Amino acid sequence: MSTPVTRTQVPDGVRDRLPSEAAAMRRLSARLDNVFRAWGYREVSTPVIEYLEAVAAGAANWGRREDLYQFFDRKGRTLALRPDMTTPIARLMATRLADEPLPLRLSYFAPVFRHRELRAGATSEIWQAGVELVGAPGEAADAEVISLACAAVRAADLTGFRIGLGHVGVVEGLFESAGVDPQAAAVLKEAMVARDLVAFEQGVARAGLSGERAERLLALVHFHGSYAEAVARFGGVGGRVAEALQHLGRVLEVLEALGVAEQVNLDLGLVRSLGYYTGVVFEGYLPGIGAPVLGGGRYDNLVAEFGRPLAATGFALEVDRLLMAQEQQGALAAEPGLDAVIACPPGQEAAAMAWAARLRAQGLAVEVDFLDRTGEELAAYARARAAARVLRPGVPSIH
């Protein structure tokens, strides 16, 4: 049975933004855009609404179609609100950007939509800022996007940022070496995404794993350490695991040269909920925020879903979590006030508005009071609007 609603409510998982909140978001957007452009990333936008077949290219790997917002158009075709930006940009890369020289560096600032459990400040309308580096394989490209993620968080005047770094090949390789079947692997990955250690241990037991095979998998989900420790613990498995560890080592070498390695910790049990990742994966964290503020990684097979095989890597920042961190750390810039409020006595509307126009032409932010407030009432309104002064017709002031 549906829950009654009123016309003054908004749906679960979405919110209004008041002027100060919208201004804070716009300032953050400008800072991030400046950083992205300085690194050569150009902004693109894609439709909020896509055909289900298009977003399913990402969601199929994800296995979470029930989290999509789906509906029909007038021709009976199934549409969906985009659940992420990476999949639409992959479509764009394979179509309208097919003739662009590679690698392509693209950025975005946009909302995505997913049904999510509404806890810990989570919403279903998720504003993201991110980048995609397409057509560049290898550790240098992986290191660039990780380093850019660090630069973006610095641009937001936030401190204490850390990145957890993993690799799909380590997880998949350990599952293969332990003989985990695909169904059991899916259960284990779901537990890893949720960071549910109890569910993971139960999944290992149900899969019939014991001895060294079980110990390695349990060590995987608990591992947070240095590269040397990772090689010592898992390097002997060989195969995909050894290859993935070698790649991580080369990425860390580049990050060391870029001066950001101290912000990066190996988190080999890291699994991202979006299942199109094929190599390096990472998440970013800030003190006092109980969920990742950033996630990303390499997805070398996704663009091929749209007919154009291309290596790619990128990340997405969760804007509202960054804003929450800015508020906690006192990094939110004060909202700019007005330069003046102009009093507007009856019959002087045209003169007051013309005066305001002249001041705006000088670059000032000016508001005309149409409610005929006077004295302390007008002064109180000006204070509420953070106006530097009150101007009255016939009283000399700024011109």
Swiss-Prot record:
Q: Gene3D superfamilies annotated for this entry?
A: Bira Bifunctional Protein, Domain 2
Q: What GO molecular-function term can you cite, just one?
A: histidine-tRNA ligase activity
Q: In which pathway does it act?
A: Amino-acid biosynthesis; L-histidine biosynthesis; L-histidine from 5-phospho-alpha-D-ribose 1-diphosphate: step 1/9
Where this protein primarily resides, as one coarse class?
cytoplasm
Provide one Gene Ontology cellular component.
Answer: cytoplasm
PROSITE patterns, per database record: AA_TRNA_LIGASE_II (PS50862)
CDD domains for the chain: HisRS-like_core
Q: Does the keyword Nucleotidyltransferase apply?
A: no
Q: Which PANTHER family does the UniProt entry name for this protein?
A: HISTIDINE--TRNA LIGASE, MITOCHONDRIAL-RELATED, HISTIDYL-TRNA SYNTHETASE
Instruction: Give a short account of what the protein does.
Output: Required for the first step of histidine biosynthesis. May allow the feedback regulation of ATP phosphoribosyltransferase activity by histidine.
What is the protein name for this chain?
Answer: ATP phosphoribosyltransferase regulatory subunit
Q: What is the lineage of its organism?
A: Bacteria, Bacillati, Bacillota, Clostridia, Eubacteriales
